[in-house]
Amino acid sequence: MNHILAIDQGTTSSRAMVFDEALTLKSVAQEEFPQIYPRPGWVEHDPSDLWSSVAATARAAVERAEIDGSLAAIGITNQRETVVVWERASGHPIHNAIVWQDRRTADLCHALAEAGHEPTITERTGLLLDPYFSATKLKWLLDHVEGARARARRGELLFGTVDSYLIWKLTGGRAHVTDATNAARTMLFDIGRGIWDPEICGLLDIPMEMLPEVRDCAAPFGMTRADLFGREIPILGVAGDQQAATCGQACFRPGMMKSTYGTGCFALLNTGEERVTSRARLLTTIAYQLGGKRTYALEGSIFIAGAVVQWLRDGLKIIREAGETQGLALSSDAAQDLVIVPAFTGLGAPWWKPESRGAVFGLTRNSGPAEFARAALESVGYQTRDLLEAMRADWAAGAEGVLRVDGGMAASDWSLQFLADIIGAPVDRPVVRETTALGVAWLAGMQAGLCPGPEEFAADWALERRFEPQMEASVREAKYDRWGRAVRAVMAV
């Protein structure tokens, strides 16, 4: 039997998983790497950490699977928007990677908006003018690394999102490519025409010579160096992490929704061939591109989801591991009604307030670790409802009523029950929770001829548990109203 290696390069760790051609998980390897915070609001990664952790976990997963040379394809999924610039000749990065959470270009984005550029950028890219996306991060690098722009014009420097950088490293510098879903997150890509936008690149003074070639999500992206796995292996599937999860959740029908809970939270609504223009400040993006055909989605992005649990552990030091939060939440005093707005790096969709910062409301002398844990988990549910309310406002006729969930926090029954309660709709957790890796493994396997097409793959999607709403509507709306007042207070400061 043939096997597929799925590389999942995330914000805090790199993971690698081996699947067989029936898409059964055979092995997993994971390695965390350091986060770099040079200044408040700045977030960086050392690209060598990204590469070394990917190489180590990929080799480890293949070894643990004991697959005896039957590796047939590789798929790559990745943290999106994060920017790497490297030398074409040596492969050496010219600066740390600037991470999607980084807010250093907030003033630049504000200036561009004041100059009237946001409508054109949004119409073409589907994105809002925000530091979250790659374009202004890339401009910052070209502005602040001496000689970088001139070198880029001479073809000496290359830009890529993390997938592109990893493909370059895996292929030994033979392929400078990306896929449509990652390109769609740069704020440089015209998602209607499927090309890099010359006008936006010109506005930001970004040499187009440094941009990668854009391909379908299932396509030949290059062959790995022979020394990595004993022979050359084709890279046949690439998608940004949230789009890969959309595929892994088999959300192929317009109206289907999924939400992934990792460091952040990302909800996607499949809108099919229709590019829905959001009136509620959501993003219009590419869900996946197969056979040259683009399928679109509305997306809402929350910057802080699982990261709020990391804050409980690393910042407040009231837990030692994430799994403790569910027990604490169960033991909390619900009457306390503590509210945490975790705007540590600003507010994401649908507010888009990069300057906002977090706050805690409703503190009393009896507020302790249990109440903080409960409020932290509840904040993720509240933010998800914000996204779903905006999606329904934009595309009410097509949205289905069930939300499919995945990611680390989806393991928490308490969190998913609260999510169902606060959104007032069923929440479905799949049997296979590694949907991001599964999605890109399927893309690579389909391109290799090992896995079925979308319809047959969707028929095999299996439900592990459905969480039905149990909270009374009056309680739900009162709690959500309190959350809304807390968010408005944060934005007013």
Swiss-Prot record:
Q: For this UniProt entry, what's an example GO CC term?
A: cytosol
The record lists ATP as bound by T11, T12, S13, T263, G306, Q310, G408
Pathway in which the depicted protein is active: Polyol metabolism; glycerol degradation via glycerol kinase pathway; sn-glycerol 3-phosphate from glycerol: step 1/1
Catalyzed reactions per annotation: glycerol + ATP = sn-glycerol 3-phosphate + ADP + H(+)
Chain positions recorded as ADP binding sites? T11, R15, T263, G306, G408
Q: Which residues bind sn-glycerol 3-phosphate?
A: T11, R80, E81, Y132, D241
Gene Ontology molecular function, alphabetical:
ATP binding; glycerol kinase activity
Which PANTHER family does the UniProt entry name for this protein? GLYCEROL KINASE, SUGAR KINASE
The record's similarity note reads: Belongs to the FGGY kinase family.
Q: What does this protein do?
A: Key enzyme in the regulation of glycerol uptake and metabolism. Catalyzes the phosphorylation of glycerol to yield sn-glycerol 3-phosphate.
Listed name of the protein: Glycerol kinase
Source organism (scientific name): Cereibacter sphaeroides (strain ATCC 17023 / DSM 158 / JCM 6121 / CCUG 31486 / LMG 2827 / NBRC 12203 / NCIMB 8253 / ATH 2.4.1.) (Rhodobacter sphaeroides)
